[in-house]
Design a protein with these regions (language model features):
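Iron-sulfur cluster-binding cysteine motifs and their immediate structural context
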Residues: 201-202, 207-225
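FMN-binding flavodoxin-like domain, especially the glycine-rich phosphate-binding loop
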Residues: 1-44, 49-188
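Extended, small-residue-rich solenoid/repeat segments and analogous flexible loops
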Residues: 179-200, 205
Length: 225
């Protein structure tokens, strides 16, 4: 199949998903002789309108994995406002060095339901968003070598297709999708209400620049507070 465009589409709060998805899309675009394009939906305003593709598009679509699944706050946007219209897609998941569980297969399923035809998929380790030690420095050079290998193999597969595949790409995970992973303490007990944790801040060090509020993916920071 001939592709006119290869897209890097991603949510990447800490930059690791962006690093993987953009690198993969750039290589695939070069191999396919196609235009390279990007769309980042990090901010709420980026998720307000529809995002539509077509048969001439190959979309490398990436999200992080939270608690073993696609982040639940992103699902309404991906499910309701992203339209494949027959485009090819590659779901990509970044996880913080525990396990991607059903994050990749869930993303694949949602993209298929959106009208994409998935042709490959990949999950990669990225430094954990809560810690500088979990998956520190990942994706590293070895990870990126695998990203590049997947990009080349994906482009080669697309070149060999006569038409869009009817069967979704095989990826690891359980279907039906399992519940979100429950974190546990050192004694194996479930940690309750961990989502209600609040960061400890030092207001004396705040210079009131407003950068944190402008960049917050969920618009959860009040710039006046």
């Amino acid at each position: 199949m001939e592709m006119q465009r290869v897209w890097a589409v991603y949510f990447s709060g800490t930059g690791t998903t962006e690093k993987v998805v953009t690198r993969m899309a750039k290589i695939a675009a070069e191999d396919l002789g196609a235009e390279y394009k990007t769309f980042c939906f990090n901010l709420p305003k980026d998720r307000e309108g529809e995002l539509s593709f077509g048969p001439g598009d190959l979309v490398i679509f990436g999200t992080p994995v939270y608690a073993g699944r696609v982040p639940n706050l992103l699902l309404p946007y991906i499910r309701d406002k992203v339209k494949g219209n027959g485009a090819l897609a590659v779901p990509v998941s970044l996880f913080g060095n525990r396990n991607f569980d059903d994050g990749l297969i869930e993303l694949r399923n949602v993209l298929e339901a959106d009208g994409f035809h998935t042709v490959a998929g990949g999950a990669f380790v990225g430094e954990h968003s809560f810690s500088r030690t979990l998956g520190a420095g990942r994706p590293d050079a070895q990870d990126m070598a695998l990203v590049e290998e997947l990009a080349h193999k994906t482009a080669e597969k697309v070149k060999g297709l006569e038409r869009a595949p009817e069967i979704p790409a095989y990826v690891a995970g359980c279907d039906p999708i399992r519940p979100y992973y429950t974190p546990r303490d050192r004694h194996g007990e479930p940690i309750k209400d961990f989502l209600k944790a609040k960061p400890v801040t030092d207001s004396d060090k705040c210079v009131k620049c407003g950068l944190c509020a402008r960049l917050c993916p969920m618009a959860a920071i009040d710039p006046n507070d």
